[in-house]
């Protein structure tokens, strides 16, 4: 209502201003004066009302401004709160992942701790066993006692081999008038001197030659062949005695028969004939072997030469057992002599 009155008052004033230029009749002067007076009173009343309403409007404007400012602040705070909520959610997810990782690591750590405890227990047991072993080594059944027993065993082996050497003496034919025993070979090494030829070595006074075994002819001396077969029988018997003394199972077993000795091969390089095959039955399977003759009486020279090769391999096996190598693939007597010499040497007792 106040605004409507103000508008009407302003319109009346504008009208009065337009009418200032009019000529007023005297009769109408009172009427106009009354109208002007009423307009002035209305304007004064409107001004007073304006002055009264102005503080109220200003206060309302301030309240509205403050409300708007606070609304904006609340909106900003709400946005910050939403951002904090998102950050809290992300942090919560990360905490859950970290918690799961921590649980897994705790499980792994507990497993490792258990393994460590088991390892510590095992280590403690091993340490106790080691201490017991050290006590045993230092005691009567220790290394010193083992060494003493080993020395006694080696001396016994030397004695037994010396008996074999006494039964089957090996000599070198040094000249037409004298023989030199192989035991008197000079030399600083365990091998002694270089091996001599097969014809210069004799076993129990009998020589051995590979010539009949490599090439048999009509003019071959039968006595030489028989002596070689007998010498090989002696060598085979000596090897069959020495091998058990050393506790070495020879690779190619021997069937002793003096000058008619055979040697067995379970994997022959020569294809055998059906008549040569001899079966041996074991608990699990049948194993066939071939016997090769160590003599030439009615035998194939190739098979006999192969038998000599196998016999030399047995001697080489014994040489390797005592830490030496063979003197040669055909040095049967020299290899046997070298084996006996090494076993009878003082260094053999301390050989490990």
Swiss-Prot record:
The gene is VPS38. Dispensable for autophagy but essential for efficient targeting and degradation of biosynthetic and endocytic cargo to the vacuole. Required for seedling development and plant growth as well as for seed storage proteins (SSPs) vacuolar trafficking. Controls multiple aspects of development by affecting late endosome morphology and by regulating vacuolar and endocytic cargos (e.g PIN1 and PIN2) trafficking and distributions (e.g. polarity), thus influencing auxin transport orientation. The keyword Membrane applies. GO terms for molecular function: phosphatidylinositol 3-kinase binding; phosphatidylinositol 3-kinase catalytic subunit binding; retromer complex binding. One of its GO terms (biological process) is protein targeting to vacuole. Component of a complex made of VPS38/USL1 and PI3K main subunits such as VPS15, ATG6/VPS30 and VPS34. Interacts directly with ATG6/VPS30 and VPS34. Its main location: membrane. GO terms for cellular component: cytosol; endosome; multivesicular body; multivesicular body membrane; phosphatidylinositol 3-kinase complex. This is Vacuolar protein sorting 38. It is found in: Late endosome membrane; Endosome, Multivesicular body membrane; Prevacuolar compartment membrane; Cytoplasm. Keywords: Auxin signaling pathway, Cytoplasm, Developmental protein, Endosome, Membrane, Protein transport, Transport. It comes from Arabidopsis thaliana.
């Amino acid at each position: 209502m106040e605004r409507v009155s103000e508008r009407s008052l302003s319109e009346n004033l504008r009208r009065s201003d337009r009418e200032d230029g009019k000529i007023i009749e005297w009769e109408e002067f009172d009427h106009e004066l009354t109208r002007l007076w009423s307009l002035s009173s209305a304007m004064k009343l409107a001004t007073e009302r304006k002055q009264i309403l102005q503080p109220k409007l200003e206060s309302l404007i301030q309240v509205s401004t403050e409300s708007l400012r606070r609304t904006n602040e609340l909106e900003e705070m709400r946005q910050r709160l939403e951002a904090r909520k998102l950050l809290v959610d992300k942090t919560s997810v990360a905490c859950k992942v970290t918690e799961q990782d921590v649980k897994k690591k705790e499980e792994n750590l507990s497993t490792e701790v258990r393994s460590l405890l088991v390892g510590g227990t095992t280590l403690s047991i091993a340490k106790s066993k080691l201490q017991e072993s050290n006590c045993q080594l230092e005691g009567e059944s220790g290394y010193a006692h083992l060494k003493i027993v080993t020395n006694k065993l080696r001396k016994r082996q030397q004695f037994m081999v010396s008996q074999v050497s006494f039964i089957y003496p090996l000599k070198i034919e040094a000249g037409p008038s004298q023989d030199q025993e192989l035991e008197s070979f000079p030399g600083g090494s365990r091998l002694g001197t270089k091996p001599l030829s097969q014809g210069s070595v004799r076993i129990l006074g009998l020589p051995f030659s590979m010539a009949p075994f490599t090439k048999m002819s009509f003019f071959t001396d039968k006595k030489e062949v028989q002596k070689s077969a007998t010498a090989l029988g002696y060598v085979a018997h000596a090897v069959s005695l020495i091998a058990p003394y050393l506790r070495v199972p020879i690779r190619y077993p021997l069937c002793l028969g003096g000058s008619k000795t055979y040697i067995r091969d379970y994997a022959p390089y020569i294809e055998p004939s059906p008549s040569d095959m001899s079966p041996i039955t074991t608990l699990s399977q049948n194993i066939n072997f071939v016997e090769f003759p160590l003599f030439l009486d009615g035998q194939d020279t190739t098979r006999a030469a192969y038998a000599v090769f196998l016999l030399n391999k047995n001697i080489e096996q014994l040489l390797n057992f005592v830490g030496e190598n063979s003197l040669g693939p055909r040095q049967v007597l020299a290899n046997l002599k070298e084996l006996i010499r090494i076993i009878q040497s003082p260094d053999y007792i301390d050989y490990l």
